[in-house]
């Protein structure tokens, strides 16, 4: 056995599309047939995968979510030179070069773990190997079920192809497909994954809620839920208000914040009239937009106004999005910046520059784009890359035309040619961290505006000639405000140090591990009668603990009243810990549910073991550092309480009233446990 630890409306639309993908399922729908075993008879396969099972949380094998499967290697694999196989694997997965696998299942697990981490180094680390008769059982940490299953078959087919060159196998193509499928999964969005990882790194419980299509951090009354940075604790009306660009503009102007003058129009003629009233240059943009789509800047003539208006209408027709009007506003000159607040406090500032190429006097613009995409290692179609690939589309061609250029133009040596009007990072724009140089007055402006909204993550897009100068010095204008903005860009700027905004957001809610948790007691044979007695004791210790949840063989009970019993044990645990009023939780996990479902939650303050079998004994691994194990010895007539290091006390066991004896044994430790969590509230 081995156990190894090795954005604006645009933002809202992005969140909406992400949520629609997730609706009703924790898996992305895609065809993965090409990744599954080939149609050859299974008896002819050299690496056979069987009995794949997924646990959504801690289980008998691992202290976290795990995919478990049996694997069998044919004699041909066993007889193949092991070192040759290792070197072939390491060639494709160079991060494994310094690993020292001791046998085939170890090598398979290491390769699979590296595939599951992908090129983006996902935060997964553990696997466990055991022997099951002639087969091996491998348990490995995972995020998305379909991606993990397909990755397992990928590695099995890969091993098969490495020892049998006649078997065709395109590793690079299949690995790329795995990564693309992960990007489409519920875990794959850069912002949501960064928040998941930020929680896990801080030992904050993180679980996916498949029915809701969102994630939960923390338990019970300490929990928050959401997708991307749109969270249940945010004000729904405030979040909605930020999607109305025209109303936001009026509000900011009323408050005296620097916002360009403008108006919302609903036809081409009025747009032209408003532009003439404001004076050129002007900007046209849709009231409801996405990632700069439909935005036209630097408009200098009435003809260009009509063209920009028609482009917006065409965009709505093409995408099927609802037309809510067009904003015509004064043009503000300056560099594009994203200013971010977390919990009302300034967090980060990013300067964004539109995609461009630098001329060499030899190549034309189309060739320069290809050279930039091919040679700049920071550019990738991976959504987590600091720079996206530059894509040539109609927007690029039209903007070049305004500059009296086209794709065949050969720029002068050293000439900088911008390809887009808008500094869109996902379209090849460049991001630069300017958090350290922003003027204090601009920081105060961010916090002043954020203070009007009950929104945790709040972004302000501004144009400023120099962000290190105060906003009232001129050349500064607020373009729009955003609730639920993307925050991954701050973790991976193209220039400058990263700012851990996901970590800031987690720290805002959970300054300590205890602020994410509630008291939890688990056991292998807890009765409803014991839970009801415990509830009375807890309320006696702290009358504020008003909502008590228990899970026994009878099902879920809240405050002693039966609530429901789901056929799946892990769903029962999830339902109970999902309750936003839950103060205290007690759960019974016996051998059958541990094998079939795992226990879902992580960490416990007290583990109560009553004649445990080998599976139930695994509950001890969930004991928190300050926790206790309570052993009931029926044959000796005693109850022993232990911490992580030693025995603390023994109590006599009344066989006729076991529940009362058990409650007496744990009662001395309950006040400190309750106080630990009650003194660490979650921030709002």
Per-region residue spans from a language model:
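Glycine-rich phosphate-binding P-loop
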Residues: 518-539
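Active-site nucleotide/adenylate-binding loops and adjacent lid/helix of ATP-dependent enzymes
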Residues: 226-391, 439-440
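ATP-dependent carboxylate activation and anion-phosphoryl transfer catalytic cores
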Residues: 2-198, 345-347, 353-360, 364, ...
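ATP-dependent carboxylate-amine ligase catalytic core
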Residues: 535-683
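Extended, charge-rich helix/loop segments that form flexible
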Residues: 368-429
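Short acidic loop-to-helix transition motifs that present clustered carboxylates
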Residues: 265-271, 465, 570, 592-594
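Conserved N-proximal alpha/beta basic substrate-recognition cap immediately N-terminal to
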Residues: 140-277, 290, 526-527
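Short glycine-biased active-site loop of nucleotidyltransferases that positions the nucleotide triphosphate
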Residues: 218, 274-276, 340, 469-473, ...
């Amino acid at each position: 056995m081995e156990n190894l630890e090795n954005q604006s409306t645009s933002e809202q639309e992005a969140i909406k599309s992400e949520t629609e993908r997730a609706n009703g399922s924790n898996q992305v729908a895609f065809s993965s047939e090409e990744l599954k075993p080939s149609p050859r008879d299974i008896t002819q396969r050299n690496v056979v995968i069987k009995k794949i099972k997924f646990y959504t949380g801690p289980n008998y094998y691992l202290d976290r979510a795990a995919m478990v499967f049996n694997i069998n290697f044919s004699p041909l694999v066993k007889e193949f030179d092991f070192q040759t196989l290792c070197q072939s694997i390491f060639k494709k997965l160079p991060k494994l070069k310094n690993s020292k696998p001791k046998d085939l299942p170890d090598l398979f697990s290491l390769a699979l773990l590296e595939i599951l981490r992908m090129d983006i180094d996902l935060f997964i680390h553990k696997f466990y190997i055991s022997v099951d008769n002639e087969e091996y059982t491998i348990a490995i940490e995972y995020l998305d079920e379909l991606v993990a299953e397909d990755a397992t078959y990928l590695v099995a087919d890969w091993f098969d192809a490495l020892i049998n060159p006649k078997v065709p196998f395109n590793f690079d193509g299949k690995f790329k497909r795995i990564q693309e499928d992960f990007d489409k999964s519920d875990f794959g969005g850069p912002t949501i994954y960064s928040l998941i990882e930020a929680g896990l790194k801080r030992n904050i419980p993180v679980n996916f809620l498949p029915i809701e299509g969102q994630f939960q951090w923390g338990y019970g009354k300490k929990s928050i839920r959401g997708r991307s940075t749109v969270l249940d604790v945010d004000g729904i009306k405030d979040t909605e208000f930020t999607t109305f660009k025209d109303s936001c503009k009026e509000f900011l102007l009323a408050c005296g914040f620097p916002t360009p003058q403008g108006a919302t129009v609903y036809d081409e003629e009025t747009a032209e009239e408003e532009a003439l009233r404001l004076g050129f240059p002007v900007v046209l943009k849709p009231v409801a937009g996405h990632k700069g789509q439909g935005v036209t800047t630097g408009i200098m003539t009435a003809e260009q106004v009509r063209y920009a208006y028609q482009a917006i209408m065409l965009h709505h027709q093409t995408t099927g999005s609802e037309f809510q009007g067009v904003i015509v506003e004064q043009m503000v000159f300056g560099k594009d910046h994203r200013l971010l607040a977390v919990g009302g406090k300034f967090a980060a500032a990013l300067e964004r520059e539109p995609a461009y190429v630098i001329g060499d006097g030899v190549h034309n613009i189309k060739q320069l784009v290809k050279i930039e995409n091919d040679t700049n290692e920071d550019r990738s179609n991976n959504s987590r890359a600091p720079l996206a690939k530059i894509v040539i589309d109609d927007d690029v061609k039209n903007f070049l035309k305004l500059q009296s250029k086209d794709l065949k133009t050969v720029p002068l040596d050293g000439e900088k040619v911008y390809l887009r009007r808008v500094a869109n990072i996902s379209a090849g724009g460049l991001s630069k961290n300017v958090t350290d140089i922003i003027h204090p007055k601009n920081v105060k402006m961010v916090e002043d505006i954020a203070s009007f909204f009950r929104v945790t993550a709040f972004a302000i897009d501004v144009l400023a000639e120099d962000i290190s100068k105060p906003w009232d010095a001129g050349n500064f204008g607020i373009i729009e405000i955003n609730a639920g903005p993307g925050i991954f860009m701050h973790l991976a700027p193209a220039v400058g140090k990263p700012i851990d905004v996901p970590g800031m957001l987690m720290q805002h809610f959970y300054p300590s591990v205890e602020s994410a948790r509630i008291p939890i007691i688990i056991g292998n044979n807890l009765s409803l009668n014991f839970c009801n007695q415990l509830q009375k004791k807890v309320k006696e210790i702290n009358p504020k603990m008003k909502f008590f949840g228990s899970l026994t063989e009878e099902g879920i009970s809240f405050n002693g009243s039966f609530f429901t019993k789901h056929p799946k044990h892990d769903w029962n645990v999830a339902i109970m810990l999902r309750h936003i009023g839950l103060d205290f939780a007690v759960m019974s996990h016996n051998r059958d549910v541990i094998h079939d479902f795992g226990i879902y939650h992580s960490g416990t303050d007290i583990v109560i073991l009553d004649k445990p079998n080998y599976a139930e004994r695994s509950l001890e691994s969930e004991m928190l550092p300050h926790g206790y194990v309570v052993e009931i010895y029926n044959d000796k007539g005693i109850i022993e309480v232990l911490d992580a290091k030693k025995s603390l006390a023994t109590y006599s066991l009344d066989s006729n009233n076991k529940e009362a004896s058990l409650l007496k044994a744990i009662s001395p430790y309950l006040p400190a446990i309750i106080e630990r969590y009650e003194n660490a509230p979650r921030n709002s």
